[in-house]
Amino acid sequence: MHAFVISGIQSGTGKTSISIAITAAIMRRNLKVQPFKVGPDFIDPSHYSFCEWAVNLDSFMMDEDGVRRSFSKWMNGKDVGIIEGVMGLFDGYRLSTFSSTSHIAKILNLPVILVMDVKAMSLSALALFEGFRNFDRGLNIAGVIFNNATRFHQKLKRVFEERGYRVFGVVPKSEILEMESRHLGLHLGMEVDRDVNALAEFAEEHIDLDGILEVSEIHNEFYKVEKDFEENGNLRIGIPFDQAFSFYYRDNLDVLKKIGRLEFFSPLKGERVDCDVYYIGGGYPELYEFPDFLKFIKKEALDEKPVYAECGGMMVLARSLESEETRRKMAGVLDIDIVFTKKLQALGYVKGEIINENPFFDTGFRGHEFHYSYAIPDSDMRFAFRTDGRGIDNGLDGALAYNTLAGYSHIHFYSTKFLPELREKV
């Protein structure tokens, strides 16, 4: 079994495109690959869907044991684990290394491959690399990949090697990686028509895959955990999943499988499922029309079926959704109006405590908030949570109505208890 972390010295080094290319190339060797993504982001994990949707590893939301448990579970039966980092290697929570890529690498005791954009850089690249190595000597930085390199950087590679450092790739500027990078952060993986074979061939030509596999063999005992994703219980859990609704942590879905049977459906295709409870994740509902789903989910909510919704899912349940161009009626389950802006309204981790009884959670939680909209709730709106983020109303989040709970917070279920008693409530 092999596993390694691919990190950048900062955002924008090309680590995501290179990680995707390496994943494609290793898959082509008939090895079973499991991709992971450090941090709470939903978009980057989707770009590995040609292999498997990447699993988020986040020590703030999951704690260290949760990171180990998740990694072990998803690596069961796999040959290679590829963990794409977030931001720069040491960039973590509130100017610390906590929850950073380096923190995840140390929790799992994995080697790090550092991606450096060496365009317009020569020996300074060596100074940067040695600075990163010396910043935390307890971290195993196994080597480097030069990105946006020229023929000159073959000479720089020799300088690195004379110092005893591994250079796993001298990657030139290329149309295929540029095309890949244009999609990142803008489109979901399911919307991208990528040439996986071309990416694999590019990686085989410019990256020392054998060398990376050589330094990334793992033997840690905690990886040997039984994988059990069998669906248990008779509770039917309806989950909309398509281009409008796709922001779900894979571990959250796995938790739900332990209390019921997941029923996925596409509102954009007019699909619907008759279930006992509904979980509406985030995504881009503002970009699409789904009038039949609005009517359907309103009826289910008003019939007191439990409905849990996050961010974009909460917007669907609101009274209206307004942007500069339009004002749309939504399901009207919640007495809330949503206003979209061009300015980011909230970004960051959140901690939440329970302040009112609700159908889904009875303990505090950790999660993430990221949205360009704000909510205008009626003055008598009741809330289930108080958070240290923005939430719906100055930190109050988790709007309550009927048997519905909806808020801006994306909650990781490893940080709380998604009520197993729900089976007795429906």
Predicted feature locations:
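Phosphate-binding active sites in nucleotide-utilizing proteins
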Residues: 229-300
